[in-house]
């Protein structure tokens, strides 16, 4: 079932932070693999940015076998995503998942607008030094599943579905394959 609107009007406190996800962490089950405290906060829009996929430092992701999501400034464009309220105890695991220590991504602060028009400040990530590359079919599927699960605007979901993946036909990690299989059986 799709989420809608902000679920928690209190926002972050000294024990928590808000994280704007636009890639594989759109999907609840995916973010909970490493960050169990993540709780849906709301759907939001990042104005004047565009979604892209790439290989950090020209190296293909060994996890996803294709380009992975990033954002870049692009006046007039927008990126939709999910804001998660997370316990600060998950900061290190989130940074680790995003490859901050290896220099794959940098932490950025973004101002996003909720569907109700409220502006909130969130933590997010931006890939540095990357070459554009299409995502694997599995990575694209996880992103599309998350967009649908959380009720991102239908027009944006269609844009995500229209992304051309690479031709990787192998497997990704077992835990991700399990999530994809569950998603496919739920839509039958």
Swiss-Prot record:
Report if keyword Lyase is assigned: yes
- Entry's Gene Ontology BP terms: release of cytochrome c from mitochondria
This entry carries the following GO cellular component terms, namely:
cytosol; extracellular exosome
What's its catalytic activity?
Answer: an alpha-(gamma-L-glutamyl)-L-amino acid = 5-oxo-L-proline + an L-alpha-amino acid
Listed binding positions for substrate are 19-24, 139
Asked if the keyword Lyase belongs to this entry, the reply reads yes
Molecular function terms in GO for this entry? gamma-glutamylcyclotransferase activity; protein homodimerization activity
Q: What class of enzyme is it?
A: lyase
Q: Which domain of life is it from?
A: Eukaryota
One Pfam family named in its UniProt record: AIG2_2
Modification Phosphoserine, positions: 173
Keywords of this entry: Lyase, Phosphoprotein
The stated induction of this gene product is: By geranylgeraniol.
Gene3D superfamilies per the UniProt record, alphabetical: Gamma-glutamyl cyclotransferase-like
InterPro entries reported for this sequence: G-Glutamylcylcotransferase, GGCT-like, GGCT-like_sf
- Catalytic residues, per the record, are 98 (proton acceptor)
What Enzyme Commission number(s) appear in the record? 4.3.2.9
Quaternary structure note: Homodimer.
Role:
Catalyzes the formation of 5-oxoproline from gamma-glutamyl dipeptides and may play a significant role in glutathione homeostasis. Induces release of cytochrome c from mitochondria with resultant induction of apoptosis.
The entry assigns this protein to a family as follows: Belongs to the gamma-glutamylcyclotransferase family.
- What is this protein identified as? Gamma-glutamylcyclotransferase
Organism annotation: Homo sapiens (Human)
